[in-house]
């Protein structure tokens, strides 16, 4: 699994720490860190919650860009 730089960038754009995002999503900071590091595959429910908090879509944050 690759690092999720899109999530990290979106979180930083909202001036949120991993702890801030974790608290808003109801998970631990370690969970957010693991998602951003590519070490954890979150549930669809958690993905949707993170998207709502950051004002992004699933496509924006979690789907891989297809190479043409």
Listing of model-derived features with the role each one plays in the protein:
Residues 1, 12-13, 40-41:
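Short amphipathic helical patch at the helix-1/turn junction of helix-turn-helix
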Residues 13, 52, 62-68:
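Short, charged recognition helix plus adjacent turn
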Residues 27-40:
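Recognition helix of helix-turn-helix/homeodomain-like DNA-binding domains
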Residues 45-60:
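DNA major-groove recognition helix of helix-turn-helix/homeodomain DNA-binding modules
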Residues 5-24:
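Short basic helix-loop element that most often maps to the first helix and adjoining turn
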